[in-house]
A protein has these predicted regions:
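Core alpha-helical elements of the protein kinase catalytic domain
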Residues: 23, 51-52
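Short hinge/loop at the helix->beta-strand junction immediately C-terminal to the helix-turn-helix recognition helix
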Residues: 30, 58-59
């Protein structure tokens, strides 16, 4: 995973509302915008905005099924992100560390 992808995912998950939305989607098979609105107590426009950012970070994918758009977590993204962070953290140690 390249540095720009790591940064994009980090920024997407840095917002507490987005993190909660991602957590809810990850724990379910799929969710609609309406289900997220009901659960989180935010407006549909706000949910749509957050879903777009999560989707652009490739954390979720959204698919239209009839009149609903279902969102689900992209398998493997968080695992790859965790490995990339571990690789960064396991790099050269700073001269300031003891």
């Amino acid at each position: 995973m390249d540095r720009s992808r790591i940064e994009k995912i980090s920024k997407a998950l840095a917002d507490k509302t987005r993190l909660k939305i991602f957590e809810a989607i990850s724990r379910s098979e799929k969710m609609t915008c309406g289900e997220i609105v009901s659960m989180r107590g935010v407006t549909p426009a706000t949910v749509s905005h957050h879903l777009k950012i999560l989707s652009e970070a490739a954390l979720i994918e959204c698919r239209r099924q009839g009149q609903f758009v279902h969102s689900k977590a992209v398998p493997g993204t968080i695992e790859a992100y965790s490995r990339a962070l571990a690789k960064i953290a396991g790099g050269k140690k700073s001269a300031h560390r003891k």
